[in-house]
Amino acid sequence: MNDVFIIAGPTASGKSELAMLLAQKFNGVIINADSMQIYKEIPIITASPSISEKKQVDHYLYNYVSIFHSDINELNSFDNISQSKVNANYNNINLQQSITKHLTDRRYSVAQYVQEACKIIRSVIHALKLPIVVGGSGMYIKALVYGIHHIPEITCEIRMQVQDLYKKLTKQEFYQKLIDLDPISKNYIHSSDAQRMIRAYEVALQTNKSIFSYHNSKLVSPLECYNVKKIILLPDRQLLYQNCNQRFAKLATNGELVDEITKIKPYYDHISISAKKALGINEIISYLNQELTIEEAITIAQQKIRQYAKRQLTWFRNQTINGYTLHYQSMSELYKAQVNDVFFN
């Protein structure tokens, strides 16, 4: 058995539900490929698998990276979301313990994700189970399927130095400093993209090279020795928007979501830039600050989620992931689709 299944598509397209069905039917294990569902303090707002779902099927790379910077290490008021235990048949290896320990002063990278996903895939296949990779983060999926350009590890000192500089300057001032240090980045990075600006500055400061100079190396697929089968979910746009609206409205009226955000709100300034991009988090905080009503917060968040889903839909339509694309007008149509034929033929 050498198969690896990948289920990709926009948010609220039914990926997780389909993965659960396949995992239960074919002795599978689900591996996350969503850049927001890695965070351990915000499982609800990121629509991570529930505890019940994790008990039914083993899930990995969910809710295990902290949203906080190193200067909040002393805080211990947050409960970790427990991961499913690895079956004893997995060659007596506890995958969660074998995963690289991520200190909160290190930004989680795509390269780290690929390394850890591959480690789990190898162990799952060794245990004669089926790895099912599920997610909507194109950068994770593309890197896992086609490989990633390797960039030198950035030291904690450089990271802290750049973070401090970014906090002191306006975005435009920081952008200008980046262009002075790395003129090539002007062609690829916009001044509104804080995360990419910081990353490019770190690389240029440490290596004296542009981050884009590393993009000339040949890519090698981390999964080249496996039989990788990909399915891309492309629902009707109106169905997708309806799913987005309904899911967030349901989450926002659940007291657990408000509790989750209330818990992290006092430490908002310590949350990483990446984690702050979790859809809905800022709107719920505005509600807690009495700047918005809950209805206004829901409406604004829903609009942003729909816009994000639209961008994902466009990305998956245009990218050459070379998978089977499944178009559907309703969720029942998705669940009735003969995906078995796609994966096993």
Curated annotation (Swiss-Prot):
Its cofactor is Mg(2+). It holds the Pfam family IPT. Residues 34-37, 195-199 are annotated as: Interaction with substrate tRNA. It is an enzyme of class 2 (transferase). The record marks S137, R159 as: Interaction with substrate tRNA. It catalyses: adenosine(37) in tRNA + dimethylallyl diphosphate = N(6)-dimethylallyladenosine(37) in tRNA + diphosphate. Substrate binds at T11, A12, S13, G14, K15, S16. It comes from the Bacteria. Keywords: ATP-binding, Magnesium, Nucleotide-binding, Transferase, tRNA processing. One of its GO terms (biological process) is tRNA modification. GO terms for molecular function: ATP binding; tRNA dimethylallyltransferase activity. Its EC number is 2.5.1.75. ATP binds at G9, P10, T11, A12, S13, G14, K15, S16. Catalyzes the transfer of a dimethylallyl group onto the adenine at position 37 in tRNAs that read codons beginning with uridine, leading to the formation of N6-(dimethylallyl)adenosine (i(6)A). Monomer. Belongs to the IPP transferase family. This is tRNA dimethylallyltransferase. It comes from Orientia tsutsugamushi (strain Boryong).
